[in-house]
Curated annotation (Swiss-Prot):
One of its GO terms (cellular component) is extracellular region. PLA2 catalyzes the calcium-dependent hydrolysis of the 2-acyl groups in 3-sn-phosphoglycerides. Its cofactor is Ca(2+). Residues 1-27 are annotated as: Disordered. This is Phospholipase A2 2. Signal peptide: none annotated. It comes from the Eukaryota. It is an enzyme of class 3 (hydrolase).
């Protein structure tokens, strides 16, 4: 599952999905 990269955010993946959700407040 991938999405557009926001500033300071990486591609959403199994290893960083939680951190990505925290950074963006959404999936």
């Amino acid at each position: 599952f991938m999405k557009v990269i926001d500033p300071g955010t990486k591609w959403c993946g199994p290893g960083n999905k939680a951190a990505d959700d925290t950074d963006n407040g959404k999936n």
